């Protein structure tokens, strides 16, 4: 599992590891850190990791087909949402659907736990331990956003909110010249 050493990338994975949610799903997780958003896709392409965190800045590569999103996550702040995801190479989904379903179940259970403000301190400690960072700094990052749970994410998927966020993100990439043309969000 490729991740960036920050709260946004790690909060759900760190929680799933420390609470035993991956283990419940029969998954043995090995973490690989990367420093630049684009590097996660490179790690997958090289075979170093099967899945990687894909931050909002690199979703343009998913639009271009370099990676496929299998699990979404949002950080909501006021009127905006950062669309973050867990992705894999396009062919990995078909060959490893069972693994991805179990990974997603563990992440969603971790999101349900870690999105509760009462648990921010604990989750910040998990992230700090993995990153070798200061817990207080990670806790500040936790307080910067509204981390959603799986129920809210599924509601956003069902009512079209997630699609609207992704369409807005795609439009921003097109307007900035980072993506040439619009593609169906469902892809």
PLM segments and residue spans:
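Conserved aromatic
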Residues: 34-35, 93, 117
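Short, glycine-/small- and polar/acidic-enriched structural segments
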Residues: 1-81
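Hinge/capping helix and adjacent helix->loop/strand transition within the periplasmic-binding protein
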Residues: 23, 77, 93-98, 102
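Secondary-structure end/capping motifs
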Residues: 96-180
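Short glycine/serine- and small hydrophobic-enriched flexible loop segments
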Residues: 18, 91, 108-112
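A bilobed periplasmic-binding-protein/Venus flytrap-type ligand-binding module shared by bacterial periplasmic
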Residues: 15-16, 82-97
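A glycine-rich, aromatic-flanked flexible loop/lid motif
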Residues: 78-83, 141-143
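Intrinsically disordered, low-complexity polar segments
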Residues: 180-187
């Amino acid at each position: 599992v490729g991740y960036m050493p920050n709260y946004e990338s790690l909060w759900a994975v760190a929680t799933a590891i420390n609470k035993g949610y991956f283990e419940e799903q029969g998954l043995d997780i090995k973490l690989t850190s990367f420093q630049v958003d684009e590097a996660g896709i490179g790690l997958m392409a090289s075979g170093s990791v099967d899945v990687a965190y894909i931050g909002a800045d690199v979703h343009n590569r998913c639009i271009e087909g370099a990676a496929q999103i299998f699990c979404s996550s949002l950080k909501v702040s006021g009127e905006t949402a950062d669309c973050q995801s867990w992705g894999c190479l396009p062919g990995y989904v078909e060959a490893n659907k069972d693994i991805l379903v179990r990974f997603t179940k563990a992440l969603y259970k971790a999101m349900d736990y870690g999105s509760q403000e009462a648990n921010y301190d604990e989750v910040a400690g998990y992230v700090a331990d993995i990153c070798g960072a200061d817990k207080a700094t990670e806790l500040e990052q936790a307080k910067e956003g509204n981390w959603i749970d799986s129920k809210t994410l599924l509601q956003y998927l069902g009512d079209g909110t997630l699609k609207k966020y992704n369409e807005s993100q795609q439009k921003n990439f097109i307007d900035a010249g980072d993506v040439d043309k619009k593609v169906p969000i469902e892809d």
